[in-house]
């Protein structure tokens, strides 16, 4: 059952419409870094960041802006209510933990047993050459609690990568974003599927045949991953957690790509040899 606080704020349309303003009388920020936007500004931000991120998928700032601009006035409130309806989700909202290098000791994570959640996470970070301090701070979501929900989603994203094993290459990111869309319904994650157009032909084929069915099936069937208190799961067996969440590990994308490159190289060498003789 939702709390009275949740019921008071469940109607985001009423709250947004009741606080109209213009660029000339912009209200004070609701939290550090907050930038209040008019409806027109939010629409322009959504369109501009969508086009920019499609042109250059490596622009994390544009992807972050797109996520915030399209999350309101409904979707981020819905995800917040998903957390409020779950005991662990409510604890996360109450404690507001943050995932970064100051709150998670990399040395400690590397000392854990190989198949634990924490070790799987840090091994994935090392393999992909990324760290926990790369997530931009939320700016464009007005409600302070909903801004935290978006921040929490961002900071947990690499844990989703780790337990699925999907790499940060475009093919892996699109597969994970599709899973996230089925699980969270955040529009930005669904819009990321348009990036499939930029993939190579063989990568597109793998996405439609392998990654899309896996992402939709697991995203819909698994528990809400936003409600996982990752900081409390670090020493737990990762296979056990996957089973509890209802997440099947997808095919090893890096291994598939490695095999495909090897086969392509062998075919090219065979063609050169045949041409020579």
From Swiss-Prot:
Zn(2+) binds at residues 157-158, 161, 173. InterPro entries: Coq4, Coq4_euk. Pathway: Cofactor biosynthesis; ubiquinone biosynthesis. The keyword Zinc applies. It is a peripheral membrane protein. The keyword Lyase applies. It comes from the Eukaryota. One of its GO terms (cellular component) is extrinsic component of mitochondrial inner membrane. Its EC number is 4.1.1.130. Its main location: mitochondrion. Disulfide bonds: none annotated. Keywords: Lyase, Membrane, Metal-binding, Mitochondrion, Mitochondrion inner membrane, Transit peptide, Ubiquinone biosynthesis, Zinc. One of its GO terms (biological process) is ubiquinone biosynthetic process. It catalyses: a 4-hydroxy-3-methoxy-5-(all-trans-polyprenyl)benzoate + H(+) = a 2-methoxy-6-(all-trans-polyprenyl)phenol + CO2. Residues 1-14 form a transit peptide. It is found in: Mitochondrion inner membrane. Its cofactor is Zn(2+). Belongs to the COQ4 family. Component of a multi-subunit COQ enzyme complex, composed of at least COQ3, COQ4, COQ5, COQ6, COQ7 and COQ9. Lyase that catalyzes the C1-decarboxylation of 4-hydroxy-3-methoxy-5-(all-trans-polyprenyl)benzoic acid into 2-methoxy-6-(all-trans-polyprenyl)phenol during ubiquinone biosynthesis. This is Ubiquinone biosynthesis protein COQ4, mitochondrial.
